[in-house]
């Protein structure tokens, strides 16, 4: 079967192509990027629904793209697309292409960072003159790709920093990290192009509870905050939140990603203690390069037990944060990041 599929690769049509063949006349907004795809797609879908739009959230977020029902000419689709889905598609096109960010990921599958960027950028090269592409042109990986590529869509450069007026109006603690704030910049940019109302956008943003296992606040008190960020499978997805937290007990471990780098400076790590668990501890220790205090444990259970013991024994009144953000794939011990996230919540209840 493997040889047959390889030999007939060009004849195989993927789900994005079948979807496009059915709904090419509908408006399609496709969101990709290394981090923040699901959160951004979900938030945009909620905003559109609040504007009484017949919005359908589908794709890699878990709602099968081909199982949508009762579609009318006014239906618009918010599609979360992975690099694999885009790379293997043949003629899929989107009216609005959104590339949130790029950092090294899935290089085992794509072979190189260049191939990975090309897979994402295919969303834009497949567009026509009537279409729009949203990206941060200062992104280190996209900058060169823009210069070297031929594309026809209208490029909208998104400033990753929110304007002061919007910053003051976003009071939801879920958007504390730099990464989540940058994703909001895309939300505002897309919403502006779609002529959506600012007051309604802000209402949804400030009510947004976040998605499971994505910087999800499990418990919060004056003494301690517990965050389940099991979805974090790279350093890039974890570092944004590490930068804004104080007195952090960071639970990290799993299968490290090829090409991944821990780029925080030593002075940015002074409030962080890393509790490294699992079989691949050396991967993380080498990446830390003595910039961070770390302790090693055989598994998540023993690491969490030690963290909670230290916090319970602390004599000061300083607020502490337990951050479960593995910065690695889960397949060494779990089926996927969801199972890993559920296990962490189970352990919290146990202790």
Question: Which residue ranges define each predicted feature?
Answer:
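Nucleotide phosphate-binding/pyrophosphate-handling subdomain across enzymes
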Residues: 54, 173-271
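Short beta-strand-centered segment that lines the nucleotide-binding/catalytic pocket of NTP-utilizing
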Residues: 53-65
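A conserved segment at the C-terminal end of the G1
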Residues: 39-56
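C-terminal helical cap/extension that packs against the catalytic core
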Residues: 260-320
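Short, basic phosphate-binding NTP loop
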Residues: 1-30, 51, 212-216, 300-311
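Flexible active-site lid/hinge loop adjacent to a nucleotide/diphosphate
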Residues: 71-175, 332-338, 344
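Short internal beta-strands
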Residues: 133-137, 251-253, 270-279
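Residue-level signal for inorganic ion chemistry
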Residues: 12, 31, 60, 100, ...
């Amino acid at each position: 079967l493997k040889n047959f599929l390889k030999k007939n690769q060009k004849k195989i049509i993927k789900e994005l192509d079948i979807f496009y063949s059915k709904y090419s006349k509908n408006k399609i907004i496709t969101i990709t990027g290394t981090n923040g795809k699901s959160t951004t797609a979900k938030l945009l879908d909620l905003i559109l629904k609040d504007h009484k739009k017949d919005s359908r959230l589908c794709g890699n977020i878990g709602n099968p793209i081909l199982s949508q029902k009762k579609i009318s000419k006014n239906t618009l689709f918010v599609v979360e697309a992975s690099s694999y889905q885009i790379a293997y598609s043949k003629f899929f096109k989107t009216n609005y292409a959104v590339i949130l960010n790029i950092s090294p990921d899935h290089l085992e599958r794509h072979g190189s960072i260049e191939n990975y960027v090309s897979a994402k950028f295919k969303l834009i090269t497949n567009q026509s003159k009537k279409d729009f592409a949203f990206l941060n042109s200062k992104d280190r990986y996209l900058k060169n790709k823009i210069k070297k590529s031929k594309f026809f869509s209208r490029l909208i450069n998104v400033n990753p920093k929110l304007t002061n007026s919007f910053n003051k109006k976003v009071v939801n603690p879920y958007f504390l990290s730099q990464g989540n704030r940058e994703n909001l910049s895309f939300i505002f940019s897309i919403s502006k192009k779609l002529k959506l109302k600012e007051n309604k956008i802000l209402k949804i943003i400030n009510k947004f509870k976040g998605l499971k296992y994505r910087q999800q606040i499990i418990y919060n008190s004056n003494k301690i905050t517990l965050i389940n960020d099991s979805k974090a499978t790279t350093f890039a997805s974890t570092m944004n939140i590490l930068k804004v937290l104080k007195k952090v007990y960071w639970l990290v471990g799993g299968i490290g990603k090829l090409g991944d780098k821990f780029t925080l400076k030593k002075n940015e790590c002074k409030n962080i203690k890393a509790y490294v668990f699992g079989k691949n501890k050396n991967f993380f220790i080498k990446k830390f390069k003595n910039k961070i205090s770390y302790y090693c444990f055989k598994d998540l259970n023993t690491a969490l037990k030690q963290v909670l013991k230290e916090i319970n024994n602390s004599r000061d009144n300083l607020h502490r944060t337990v951050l479960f953000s593995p910065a690695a794939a889960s397949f060494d011990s779990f089926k996927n990041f969801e199972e890993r996230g559920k296990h962490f919540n189970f352990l919290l209840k146990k202790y």
